[in-house]
Amino acid sequence: MSDSVDIEEKPPAPPLRMNSNNRDSSALNHCSKPLPMAPEEKNKKARLRSIFPGGGDKTNKKKEKERPEISLPSDFEHTIHVGFDAVTGEFTPDLCGSQMGTGKLPEGIPEQWARLLQTSNITKLEQKKNPQAVLDVLKFYDSKETVNNQKYMSFTSGDKSAHGYIAAHSLNAKTASEPPLAPPVSEEEDEEEEEEEDDNEPPPVIAPRPEHTKSIYTRSVIEPVALTAPAKEASTSPVTPQPENSNSSTSTLYRNTDRQRKKSKMTDEEILEKLRSIVSVGDPKKKYTRFEKIGQGASGTVYTAIDIATGQEVAIKQMNLQQQPKKELIINEILVMRENKNPNIVNYLDSYLVGDELWVVMEYLAGGSLTDVVTETCMDEGQIAAVCRECLQALDFLHSNQVIHRDIKSDNILLGMDGSVKLTDFGFCAQITPEQSKRSTMVGTPYWMAPEVVTRKAYGPKVDIWSLGIMAIEMVEGEPPYLNENPLRALYLIATNGTPELQNPERLSAIFRDFLNRCLEMDVDRRGSAKELLQHPFLKIAKPLSSLTPLIIAAKEAIKNSSR
């Protein structure tokens, strides 16, 4: 057969998206909440003398060293009383708040909240329609507990083929900076702002997603901001806070969570002891060969290597434990991955302690993340159905083992060159127990968050189903809903709008639209479970996974060409 005939028989290249996914996102400057005033020097000394009566005596030095260190106050709660004037459409001081009779003026909306609101693009009509939702998102957005999540491995290598893998795959060691929205720590840990400077290396060739699409974490709120009506104005109408599904058991849950968090503090030695009980004994350099560096991050390095015994290509993450601010998270993630192996999950293979470094061996998927395919190519319904089916199989497995992933999005779906689809990044996963069947911590990535997470209500495994529905829209439109909105307004829209509207719903089949509606049902009880959705007719039109391979290759080519 001639070469010309071969050329004619080649299938057409997969369609590419015309719009670029490289968007600028300007970080918002947030005013930090003021620190509590330091006690007066005189009172401070008197208090110290009462605690350490022999403080100046040298003979007591040994005893002083043995005494426990008195820590600074923590977990300050600054209660803000805000009302809403339905006539003027303005947030006002709460004139009947707890400060009346104290001689202090009521606070009203804090100045930094007012500034955020002015630049949020939330209209006056929207504020008037649902003022409590506005306060909810302001409270979250300005929370001192909100910390930015720079994924553990940020790609800085010249090997563009590794970009999706490194960008998507993390083992909970997060770096901190301060962009518009941001994240993670552990639900079992006190949140601290980690201030690590970014590596002074050249930026990656491929522009990353906007900062505000990164995962976020904020801790549970025991008493959310309550919206009260001003009492002295006849023109104002009371606004009742949205129900939080709170009862005595929920209050107990919050208190128990705080207690567990305090108890969970581990010393470095305890962490090392725990790691020694988890990792394998031996020298990994004798088990693996052909190490090739594919990624470098502030907290460690990622290599590919070959298992000498099996010939399997693996990814090895080498982390310096001294540089990990939240070592407990690493233990948690390893334990979850080790106990939950599945064909649709990027599986944990092994781990080793090598000097001061922890080496974690994982499956390696050379196809990169689904994000590359979503942003660079156009997927048809059969291909989307195939991806959804594989993800639902992973979620059904996790949910049946009482694990919520809490950060489902295209960045956390890795692809093999054969079209295999696997879920990764268990840094935010939560274990459900009979004592704690619901969670309330705001975790995930804003644009993929379920409404019940944004409003900080108790939630369960179905938050993953909502995020899967948003990811399905991502596969259709190349981005999640509200991505071009101001992040604060996006949170408001998620909390109030319900199921997001599609740009061109008429282009989708009826069964696909029904599948999306089942995933994106506001009523959690009516939202489909992973097990139920695996029986949905939409999944019956799924194409073979091998149909994803041309898209993966096309995405890699598009990325390669854009970097020239």
UniProtKB/Swiss-Prot annotation:
Keyword GTP-binding (UniProt): no
Location of region: GTPase-binding: 65-123
GO molecular function: ATP binding; metal ion binding; protein serine kinase activity; protein serine/threonine kinase activity
Domain Protein kinase: 288-539
One GO location term (cellular component): cytoplasm
Acidic residues composition-biased segments: 186-201
Family (UniProt): Belongs to the protein kinase superfamily. STE Ser/Thr protein kinase family. STE20 subfamily.
Function of the molecule: Serine/threonine protein kinase that plays a role in a variety of different signaling pathways. Involved in early neuronal development; required for cell cycle exit and differentiation of primary neurons. May be required for the formation of dendritic spines and excitatory synapses. Cooperates synergistically with mturn to promote primary neural differentiation within the neural plate. Involved in the cement gland formation.
Name used for this protein in its record: Serine/threonine-protein kinase PAK 3
Phylogenetic placement of the source organism: Eukaryota, Metazoa, Chordata, Craniata, Vertebrata
